[in-house]
Amino acid sequence: MAQVRAGLPGEAGARRQALVGVVGRCAEAGRRLDAEAAALDQVRGLEGPGAGMALDVAEGRFRALAARTVAAHATLAALRERYAPSATDPVTGSVEQAKDRLLFATAHLNATRRSIDAADGDGTARNLRAAEGAVAQAEILVTGVERLATRLREAAALVPAALTGAEAELTAARHGRSRASLATGELNARLAHADGVLAAVREELTGALPYDPLDALRRITRAVDRLDVGRSGVLDTAALLVARTSLESADDFVTVHRGAVGPEARALLSEAARTPVAGARAAFEADTAARAARGLAERDVRAHGTPYPDTTTIGLPGAVLGGILLAEDPDGGPPATFGGPATRGRRHVRAPG
């Protein structure tokens, strides 16, 4: 897909053929999933004997997540006190969305219990799938806050060593050890830029205001990379940490907004995730692509708007944005179900016979 988007292959016919191949493989994967849908239903047995156990598991996950969500709220508040606003931007709204998903899950877990008591197999399966989807997305949102706290601690611990490694790179460049063939004026300009970046980061470290350690690492590694000396291990580590964090953040956002995010953001993120991240240059590319994918995904969500804006059903708009519900029935359903394009919406509300 990267080659197609960049205009390769060069011939229009070859590009069309490449796209036809991609579409064909996707269609075949969908057919295989559709063919296995009935077997998946049989394995889970949500309309019958498997429902009780599946409900117990979902309720257990729900209870654990409710406690983690409270802790994540406190964690995020502490991060906002300690770091610059940009540091927590990737998880802005995550705790609130997790709470919204859990409220939605509560309603459907309760409805599942009532359906089991009424021997309503269809209602049991439909409500339980909706609850499971909401719980799964709440876990992604809460885990994102917890993981970002870890990444920020790792980055803050790495910044001093990254500054030291960057200084060594600058010294090497000043002594003519750059691998790039640069004119003296260009080399001096790049050295001056890198000096300015490092000075700004040092000022942030010693200043009274909070700073963003991941952004500091991004600026350090990219400024020094332009000198092309041959990166030290600590700078590679820093670049990889930044890229990994961007990939994780973008993947979380796309996953919990899959009902609104379009193919462009998905393709770019998939491409970034598949690229082997070995060394700083590859890390820069992955970081850039992941951030671009996140930006495209956010644009898609804004363009989509809030579904069912007048609903009184708690959590319904978020469930539709998240792709938990497919918005094909009047109540926002059916819930997305394991299968391909022809079967993933098979849990429709059945019309009275």
Protein language model regions, located:
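Long, charged/polar, soluble alpha-helical segments
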Residues: 1-353
